[in-house]
Amino acid sequence: FDIADEAKKIGIPFEGHLPVTVTAEDASRAGQKSFEHLIGILPASSSRSEELFQAAQVEFAEELRTHGRFDELHDSKLGEEMLDTYSPRRVEELSAVFKSNGTWQCPTFTLLHMFAYGDDPALQSDPRVKYMPPRVVAGWHPDELDGKRSPQDFAFAKKEFQRDLEVVGAMQKAGVGILAGTDTQNPYTFYGFSLHDELGFLVQAGLSPIEALQAATLNPARFFGKDKDLGTIEKGKLADLVLLDANPLDDIANTRKINAVVYRGNLYARPALDAMLAKVQALAARPLIGKVLFKTIQEQGIDAAVTQYRELKTKHPDDYDCSEDEFIGLGYGLIHIKNFKGAIEIFKLAVEAYPQSYNTYDSLAEAYMDNGDKDLAIRNYQKSIEINPGNANGIAMLKKLNSQ
């Protein structure tokens, strides 16, 4: 609550995840402007919400003691009781508190659906995967989701998802502000496409098509206090528009039937949009430079890999995925197998390619430290902090090195 008090003093709104140690009502009264992912909402919607809250505190302490983390209540033994004691009356009471305090809800159904249906082969074979980098999709397999969830976990999450839909529909009817969010970069939240998925889930929850559209347009404008400039199509407002071939008020799925986009005064007709999608698909299909270089390191050594990278960048500058993540992932992979000198050379390439990224210097510093080169480790941690004064890891490691 100290954060809430300080935010009030300096006039900064705060929002985010509901902490497990705070009730939904208390967070709302303290001024939390929005809740993300409906965290804590279903337990608060139980006729035994107080008992569940207290039991969760005990479980929270035990999980921290034994595992160093706490999975949400929906993953605990209290989950079934939470669903069995769901109370529409409690939802009405919660909604009244939220409406009175101006507390919004951002369900991110696209994310919640992934947790519930991540084991569904249809989801895994979604054709939109072709627009995603392979290194991102690699972590989307059910065995990789949320700590290797069991079939029982997925079965429970499916029941929970249906209840989440019901809760949001009830809150909308009660006048609670709803925001369309997607938490993009999580599994199966496809860039751009996921907002259309979210609109569909909002309608499934009971919102009308116009209410779902407002959750993605007018409501965010109001939430940020920008409704004088954004949120509706009116004279004098910013004219960033999506032009459709069919009416979304008849069927929310019609938001996908895009004819053109107007953005910052530029018109992008369907052929231009299709060309953009084709480019994204081509970029996503590029070979990963990390995988290419690792093979060379294994077969010929780090010097050959560095030479190979420079040749590829000269002769085929756009044909490989040379994102920062590729260098960082490869470098830490080399650290993992204790090839510290190799990691240093890879992180040097990362610094060369991304000189304004604090993380490249932070990673290079770690490799130097692991290799026993304290002075160069300090120098690079200092550079990372120079770029990002809030780099907590760099600050901590620099303090540790300077004390040795």
Label the model's feature ranges.
Residues 41-201, 205, 271, 278-284:
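Active-site neighborhoods of metal-dependent hydrolases
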Residues 200-201, 332, 366, 400:
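Residue-level recognition of tetratricopeptide repeat
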Residues 324, 340, 358-359, 392-393:
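Helix-start (N-cap) detector for alpha-helical repeat units in TPR-like alpha-solenoids
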